Amino acid sequence: MIEAAIGRGVYGMIITDHDNVMGGLVGKKAARKYRNFRVIPGAEISSQSGHILAIGIETDVPKRLSVEETVERIHDLGGIAIASHPFSRRVRPSLREECLKTDGIEVFNATNRGLANVQAVSLARTNGRPATAGSDSHWVRTVGKAGIICDDPLNDIRRGQTRLFGTYASLWRMRVFNFRQLASALVNRPIWK
């Protein structure tokens, strides 16, 4: 993934695997061999209401906590908390209100479609919340599709001093990925049990 990012002109990435920091820590270590490339570890925490990006942490945060408690744990670890894709279909509507307890809102997600990103932009602007963007990459071909441009990611996000960029991930590639996820879930956890 690092080589794909470099190939697309990206000079750093925030790696946030679901509910654990391991991928980010491995990526941070792997990035040492590349000059002028930085990996910031984190996790995409599954709170009771939806996903919260924990950026800049190196210790896991338990899942299924309230948004408020999730944010508190992230802050205790020195990280920042971003409401991830608050208007996607996978998120409970309560996150849309609770995301104002976070440090910022992901307003562009390369895998969202329809009004989800537009609604997130409106929520962030209306409430004066810092905005972020992300590829939400689950495979190498979407790395670098969206992100932030800044000098000091953690502090610049906190202050709302980032520029965003983004294009949508290919619908075809997303469908293939989602089909593979579904097939894997059915094999590993059959619905009839």
Predicted segments, located by residue:
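Short glycine/serine/threonine/alanine-rich loop segments
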Residues: 10, 37, 79, 129
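Short, conserved beta-strand segments within well-ordered enzyme catalytic domains
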Residues: 14, 38-40
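Short beta-strand/loop segments at the ligand-binding rim of alpha/beta enzyme cores
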Residues: 36, 74-83
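Aromatic-lined carbohydrate-recognition surfaces of secreted/lumenal glycan-active proteins
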Residues: 82-90
